[in-house]
């Protein structure tokens, strides 16, 4: 069969999508050993993992761009799961970083608005995972700030308030949530090894996030089939019998 004949006889393959929406911790997640890369590897031939991370962004800006990323009427192209991972920038100290700072009440409202928007475009709450910001290692981050010629512009206690707000939004909206801020500090452990500069994730921190996120995500994608048959199961003499239409799975 020619390629044109094959195109006419086979149904289109719809590749399910997992959307990662967040700030720099999401943007950097596709670096070597990043948590997004680990997810993509785990979901090979089941889902495409899309990185929609925007370094430096807060929920005020995220709320504006979300409708440009996921449009109403996408139907079958809608993600099977969405992570919303903001707060590291919203929680900056207003006096030191007014551009990125978002007041706590507005942060909560923005998260809630984004979950409600997803519902309005047929992505139900069961597909959504909120992720709290990780804890801040102030000593390490202060060194980074000094190198940039500024004062310490974040405090872990403030980040914790935003993490609590994220948890409350998840409870109110009925979404899953990963409380990264609490988990990384469980039993008063030294969490500095999870962070590369006091704020962003180290290789160990990426593994930690993946390990705790996967069970939540797996619930949403476990029923999805592996796309196309294993090579050992492809019909040898007439491969199109295996590779077109109902043989996709």
Swiss-Prot record:
Active-site annotation: 24 (nucleophile), 197 (proton donor), 200 (proton acceptor)
Keywords carried by this UniProt record: Hydrolase, Lipid degradation, Lipid metabolism
Site location (Transition state stabilizer): 56, 89
The species this protein was found in: Rattus norvegicus
Coiled coil: none
Transmembrane regions: none
GO biological process, one term: lipid catabolic process
Its EC number(s): 3.1.-.-
Location of N6-succinyllysine modifications: 63
One Gene Ontology term of the molecular function aspect: identical protein binding
Name of the gene this protein is made from: Iah1
Protein's job: Probable lipase.
S-S pairs: none
Name of the protein this chain belongs to: Isoamyl acetate-hydrolyzing esterase 1 homolog
Family that this chain belongs to: Belongs to the 'GDSL' lipolytic enzyme family. IAH1 subfamily.
